[in-house]
Amino acid sequence: MIKLRLKRYGKKREVSYRIVAMRSTSRRDGRPLEELGFYNPRTDETRLNVPAIVKRLQDGAQPTETVRNILQKAKVFEQVNA
């Protein structure tokens, strides 16, 4: 199963995340199938590749709870259903 989840990177205590598509059995920081966006919790900055995310969701990828919340804020699910 493909999951949309966060991949951690950055310095200690200055963490940022990449939103990636990965197999559910992969390690957290393993090689992703595709990088779909960026999330910085310290500044609440988010950059998303919306067409690629919509395609992955339509193909059956399951977002984790945190990624689901980020996508709901960006109103990505409205584009999936349209």
Curated annotation (Swiss-Prot):
It comes from the Bacteria. Coiled coil: none annotated. GO terms for biological process: translation. One of its GO terms (cellular component) is cytoplasm. InterPro entries: Ribosomal_bS16, Ribosomal_bS16_CS, Ribosomal_bS16_dom_sf. GO terms for molecular function: structural constituent of ribosome. Belongs to the bacterial ribosomal protein bS16 family. This is Small ribosomal subunit protein bS16. It comes from Gloeothece citriformis (strain PCC 7424) (Cyanothece sp. (strain PCC 7424)). The lineage of its organism: Bacteria, Bacillati, Cyanobacteriota, Cyanophyceae, Oscillatoriophycideae.
